[in-house]
Amino acid sequence: QWRYDGNQANYNVSPENEFSNKHTADMIARSVRNGWMPFYPQFNENNFSLYKDAEKNGAKNDDEVKQFVVDKLKSKELQYSVADPDAEENFPRVWYIWRGNAIMSSAKGHEYFLKHYLGTHHNSIAEATAKDLVKDVNWMENAPTGKMDLIVDLNFRMDTSALYSDIVLPSASWYEKADLNTTDMHSFIHPLSAAIPPVWEAKTDWQIFKAISKATSEIAKTHFNEPIKDIVTTPLAHDSPAEISQSSLQDWMTGECEAIPGKTMHGITVVERDYTKIYDKFNSLGPNAKNGLLGAHGNSFNAGDFYDQLLENKDHLQTIDNVEYPSIGQDEEVINAILHLSSLTNGELSYRAYKNAEKKTGLKLTDLAEGSRNVKLSYSDLQAQPRRYNNSPIWSGLMNDGRAYAAFTYNVERLVPWRTLTGRQHFYLDHEGYIKFGENLPTYKPSPTPKLYGELD
């Protein structure tokens, strides 16, 4: 779709500068290399081969492998896939679709999906306009069409994505499976129950994923029969020190600063993959849930003892290489593991999360969980009676004594800082990027016209 876009300044009234006059594709390329957003595939070279090249060039540990990658990126010997998205080596060939109509309503630019992803009939009438506008992203005169070799859709609807897929895996509908559902409209937890078994060849989503993982592990015994090292790039994360690592918008690629992983550029991590173990890992809850911290939105807690409780149920265990793990191979096992280890449904874990929040804020907060420390919900509890969430610092509402959920009552009434760099809510954003785009204050801007979008012949 980027091929049919003009410069960003064409669509919005913005101050005149190097940011607002940049093409969207160039901006995305910069965002990826500076660590502002993810993009996969990562490079124009295979990740596994890249690791082996690092070893051949003398890299003896993970840090030296990372430096090898940085040096190749700086010299431009190694290129980002995002900088040449139409090159054969830079786009995937297999597309799994789940929980969304990706080829229709979820696709902004539906006609371009039909043209370039599928190579089928389309109603695209816009002319490609980006040739003389992109600077960092390579322009290919004849863009590939039909990039995908295989599209697999998990679906119980015959929607647009299913109609255009090579394989449709029939998924169970809402009344044929055990599942959990939530909404931002109220604070109750929805348990989905199977009124009837999945019909004909249908399976639940979880069982379909399980079957895919099993087939993948079997194939891996031929193609990846032993562990292999992978190189993974990750963007700078919210709720981490990296969040404040770039006080100004400098680009290491243009020499404005040094390329430092996790600071001036994306993170680089070496990960060991064992593709023969995917099925085993899919069916079992691994030790990181016990030994690490769980949580979200800057709040965390240890749940090691509750992980051990899952191991006490001998009917729901997986034994892998003579080690026992909690089983999550069946739908209800997954649901109960989630409920058991969530601060929203396990009152003791909510208390621990507030305890950790006290250390960060210096405020007294554990009283918010005192009344529910003995609450521990299971799937059968939810089926028997509607249940609400516990209070939890993961969300900003307070729901004591049947109170209706209202966002930010936690911040207003308990003086807990907002989840921003300053801890305050902001009407004005004193941020270099927002200022350059003219978005530092909320200002009305009319929608672009169909003519600007190239929708008129």
Residue ranges and their predicted role:
Residues D205, S217, T233-L236:
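Charged alpha-helix within mobile-element recombinases
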Residues D239-S247:
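C-terminal segments that line or cap access tunnels to active or ligand-binding sites in enzymes
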Residues Q207-T222:
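Non-catalytic, well-ordered alpha-helical segments in soluble enzyme domains
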Residues A128, T222-K229:
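Flexible, glycine/charged-enriched surface loops at secondary-structure junctions
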Residues Q1-E201, Q246-D457:
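A cross-kingdom feature strongest in bacterial/archaeal respiratory oxidoreductases
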Residues F113, D205-I208:
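Stable alpha-helical elements in mature extracytoplasmic
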Residues E226-S240:
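A glycine-rich phosphate-binding loop feature that marks nucleotide/adenosyl-phosphate handling sites
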